[in-house]
C-alpha cells in the first residue's frame, strides 16, 4: 500500500477556488507513487505523484505544484462524477495522445465550443490554466478571461444531473 494522506486545509482552500462544492474533499487521497512511475496519475479518485514530487502540502509549494494539483484534482472530479479516468487515459494512450503530450494540447480558447467537448487531459489543462490566471500567477487579457468564463460556465453551474464530463473519444490536437 503506497504512503498516502488526505488533503490539507490549505490544499482544500486552493481546490475550492475552482471546484467549489463539486468535490468530496474528504475522499481524496494524495499518494506517493511507486518509484517506477514517472508521471502523476489519478486513475481511481486518488492522486499518485512520483516519489520526488510527493509533498506534504502542495498549498505551501511553488506555483507549478499548485497548478499541477488543480490539474490532477480535475481527474478526481471527473472520477467522482462517473467518468472512468483509467479508461479515458487508456483510450488516449491507445490513440497516441500521450506521445508528445498531444492529449494535453487544447485548441485556441475561441475554438472551444464547450467544456464537455474536451478530452480528460484538455479539461484538466483548461481548469489548471484558469486557476493560474484567477490566482494571479499568470496575466490574462479581458478577452481571454471572457473566453474562460464562456467555456467554464457549465462547469461552474453544474448540478447533479448536469455535469460537463469529458468525452472518451474527444479529438486529440496535433503536437505543437
Show where each model-derived region lies.
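Metalloprotease/metallohydrolase-associated module, dominated by Zn2+-dependent proteases
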Residues: 3-25, 29, 46, 86-176
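Structural preference for long, well-ordered alpha-helical segments in enzyme cores
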Residues: 11, 69-73
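Short pre-active-site segment immediately N-terminal to the catalytic Zn-binding motif
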Residues: 21, 39-40, 49-70, 83-86, ...
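Mature, structured domains enriched in cysteine- and short glycine motifs
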Residues: 30-38, 42
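A conserved catalytic-core signature of glycosyltransferases
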Residues: 43-44, 63-64, 122
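Catalytic Zn2+-binding segment of zinc metalloproteases
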Residues: 73-91
Amino acid at each position: 500500500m503506497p504512503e498516502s494522506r488526505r488533503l490539507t486545509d490549505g490544499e482544500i482552500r486552493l481546490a475550492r477556488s475552482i471546484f467549489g462544492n463539486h468535490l468530496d474533499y474528504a475522499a481524496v487521497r494524495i499518494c506517493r507513487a511507486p518509484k517506477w512511475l514517472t508521471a502523476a496519475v489519478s486513475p481511481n479518485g486518488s492522486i499518485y505523484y512520483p516519489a520526488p514530487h510527493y509533498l506534504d502540502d502542495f498549498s505551501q509549494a511553488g506555483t507549478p505544484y499548485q497548478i499541477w494539483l488543480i490539474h490532477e484534482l480535475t481527474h478526481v472530479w471527473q472520477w467522482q462524477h462517473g467518468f472512468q479516468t483509467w479508461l479515458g487515459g487508456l483510450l488516449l494512450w491507445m490513440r497516441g495522445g500521450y506521445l508528445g503530450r498531444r492529449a494535453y494540447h487544447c485548441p485556441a480558447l475561441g475554438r472551444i465550443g464547450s467544456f464537455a467537448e474536451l478530452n480528460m487531459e484538455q479539461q484538466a489543462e483548461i481548469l489548471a490554466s484558469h486557476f493560474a490566471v484567477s490566482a494571479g500567477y499568470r496575466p490574462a487579457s479581458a478577452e481571454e478571461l471572457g473566453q474562460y468564463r464562456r467555456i467554464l460556465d457549465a462547469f461552474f453551474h453544474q448540478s447533479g444531473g448536469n455535469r460537463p464530463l469529458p468525452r472518451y473519444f474527444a479529438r486529440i490536437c496535433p503536437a505543437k
